[in-house]
Amino acid sequence: MYSIPSTPQPIMKKLLLSLCSIALLNSCDDGDLTLETINFDSATAQECSLNNVVYKINGNQLLLIEIPATSLPYENKIGDKTFTINSNNKVIYRGYNNTVSSASICSTIPPASPSVTEEWNAIAGTISIQTTAIYSAANALTGAIKISKYRHAITFNNITFAKSNGNQVYETFVFGDYDTNATALPMNFNPDSIQLCSSGQTLYNAQSGGIEGLYIQNLSSNLLDSTVLGIAKTALINTNNENLLTYRLFSLALTLGGNSTYFCASPLPDSPLVKEEWTGQAGVSNTSGIIEVTTTTNGSGYSHSIHLKSVTFSNPLAGSTFYYGDDILIGTLLSN
């Protein structure tokens, strides 16, 4: 009787090894192959503001990350952070018996339906978060380029999930991007509000009772020279300790009528609290970071038109920069 020959052992071993490496989520033992897959590639990352949970939903599946807010995992600061998965830094996958919504994870009291049918808890590995700045398109009129948001690219490395039927390990699992909004910087200055401190060395522009201020310390003496009329006078920002340009956004409003008390003090007062501070990058001759002042007569006095040209601001704490614009009028200063 003719019998079907058995498959050679080397071929069987190669086949088994190939099957064991097909998918990301699988477990393989001596003779059984279990294939399980989860896919959140097309899902958008969202956050629960109450519990600092970042999550993705795909139909009846949910994948969440919970890192204490005190650890500042999604800080608007360019750079890389790594968190070890443990009882504080959690990654959890859940399957439900029906389509899931944010209410199932973000509500103080989750709805009774849908219910959890499967849950995997990560018990080892790390969470890597790489943060970069995302910029707006250049303003058609001014050329200004602002930071619109910060993007946090999240990856799990060597993560182990504990499942009901054993552990599942990923060498690399890309969670995806989670975006946070950048702090809005109004940069809304009335040219007529610019003032010069009595020292003659500090220019500032701020609305009385406003929440922001722009100032230049150690102003070059030639810029306001009233003997040079109709000709643009220029100087470079933040060069040789001159023309130190700074923008401040405050947590609380400036005192009404108190702008000179604040901006002309040395050092500047601690109140109101500074929410964000940005400094002008050092200028490059004929290229960037330029202060330009043109002086003309104004009755018995003078009018100084003050422009900032091709200025980039930087925030060392956040590692970020933004472009203020090609040619911005920051003030028209009147003098006698």
Residue spans for each PLM region:
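N-terminal amphipathic/basic-hydrophobic helices that include classical n-h-c signal peptides
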Residues: 1-11, 246, 259-261
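Bacterial Sec-dependent N-terminal signal peptides
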Residues: 2-8, 17-56, 336
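Short, hydrophobic/proline-enriched secondary-structure or compact coil segments at domain edges
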Residues: 50-61, 152-155, 199-210
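Surface-exposed helix/loop patches within compact recognition domains
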Residues: 52-146, 210-301
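A structural detector for beta-sheet-dominated domains
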Residues: 58, 86, 130-132, 157, ...
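Ser/Thr/Pro-rich, low-complexity mucin-like regions
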Residues: 143-184, 298-323, 334-335
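Surface-exposed beta-loop interaction hotspot
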Residues: 172-218
